[in-house]
Regions:
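Conserved N-terminal structural module of periplasmic/extracytoplasmic solute-binding proteins
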Residues: 1-106, 121-122, 312
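Hinge/lid segment of periplasmic solute-binding proteins
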Residues: 15-17, 74, 96-152, 298-309, ...
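Extracytoplasmic/periplasmic substrate-recognition and gating elements
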Residues: 82, 256, 294-336
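Paired acidic/hydrophobic, glycine-rich loop segments that form the ligand-binding mouth/hinge
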Residues: 92-95, 276-281
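A ligand-binding cleft/hinge motif common to bilobed small-molecule-binding domains
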Residues: 101-105, 282-299
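Short, solvent-exposed loop/beta-turn-alpha elements that line the ligand-binding surface or hinge
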Residues: 114-126, 169-173, 198-206, 224-245, ...
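Extracytoplasmic/periplasmic solute-binding protein
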Residues: 136-146, 151, 178-235
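Glycine-centered hinge/linker elements that transmit conformational signals in sensory
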Residues: 181-188, 229-263, 308
């Protein structure tokens, strides 16, 4: 819990602070988050460890509460800010995305996190992760990254090898989106040929977890910001030729059966043997199956991790996404 370990650290940066914590009378901090299941258990364990060690030593006691889903958390925060009937009071710390932080800060409800970290400490993080917490009209840091990720390409290595041995396909061909599309077509035709008595029963090769990421990052790789925001105004730059290029490497292979999306996530489609590879969040690797389960039985598989494919001739750009944590403005003792 990075932000929790920073609790009290601000005192080292601002020694003239009048706040003095008392281990015998600890200050209580409330944290809202959206974790559930194993993630919630791990987060609760980190809080318990903090309370029993550094928190106990300094006089800080943290209580964590899940609000359910990301949407539930955003609504709880929005209701608290608006003072809606039945709403809870704002927590001291909450997990959030940049859009929610921006809305809350417009109401003047957030504390500046800049004093919590030295410039050297901030420099240890990916710059774009930190910069997301700053807003164009303010030099204060309002969102600190704690759960960021990018995208990767994951492949069922076991079944890929069978396909590669039979057709001469190479992993190098998967470095570009056009190469993935061509490989997916070849895979469909190859699997279709395995059952000559059944026409058009080829299998899909590839899937994409986030269509929005595909279009936004694809345009960026071609040098265009699909959503261009300047002075608070949004301009959609939908260059017809570039959009068509993205369309031809997304919609067309989906229609032809070369790409597919069946389950909620593409890792689900790997598990059922419906696809061989996909592009998704780094966090999705936790759910990549070690077995494929079909009507014909169950078989063990291995995996390959690669960088996501880039449009041929395009700039190597990947998405950065995920949540951070924000601290609400209250009093010196709770913000300390």
């Amino acid at each position: 819990v990075l932000l929790l370990t920073a609790c009290g650290h601000i005192g080292n940066i601002t020694p003239d602070s009048k706040v003095k914590l008392n281990p015998n009378k600890p200050v209580s901090l409330t944290v809202w988050h959206y974790y559930n299941g194993a993630q919630q258990a791990a987060f609760d364990q980190l809080i318990s460890e903090f309370n029993a060690t550094e928190g106990k030593e300094k006089g800080i006691y943290v209580e964590g509460y899940t609000q359910g889903s990301v949407g539930d958390l955003e609504k709880a925060v929005s209701d608290a800010v608006a003072g809606a009937v039945g709403a809870q009071s704002l927590p001291d710390i909450f997990s959030t995305y940049a859009d929610t932080v921006y809305a809350v800060q417009k109401e003047g409800k957030l504390a500046d996190l800049t004093p919590y970290f030295t410039k050297e400490e901030q420099a240890e993080y990916v710059e774009s992760y930190i910069q997301e917490g700053y807003f164009h009209d303010d030099s204060s840091l309002y969102l600190f990254p704690v759960a960021k990720s990018t995208e990767i390409m994951m492949i069922n290595a076991t079944d890929w090898q069978t396909f590669a041995d039979a057709t001469g396909a190479s992993l190098d061909e998967l470095s570009t989106l056009e190469g993935v599309t061509e490989t997916a077509k070849r895979y469909y035709e190859w699997t279709d040929s395995l059952t000559p008595d059944v026409a058009d029963d080829g299998k899909a090769f590839y899937g994409i977890d986030s269509m929005s990421n595909y279009f936004i990052i694809g345009m960026k790789q071609m040098g265009v910001d699909l959503f261009d925001v300047k002075d608070g105004k949004l301009t959609i730059r939908a260059d017809k030729e570039k959009i068509r290029r993205l369309w031809d490497n997304y919609y067309v292979p989906y229609v032809n059966g070369y790409f597919a999306s069946f389950g909620k996530f593409r890792s689900d489609d790997i598990k059922t043997g419906d696809i061989l590879a996909y592009t998704g969040s780094v966090s999705s690797s936790m759910y990549f199956p070690d077995q494929v389960i079909t009507d014909d039985g169950t078989r063990d598989i291995d995996y390959i991790v690669m960088q996501p494919p880039v449009l041929e001739g395009g700039e190597h750009i990947c998405v950065q996404q995920g949540a951070g944590m924000a601290v609400t403005k209250s009093d010196e003792r709770h913000e300390y």
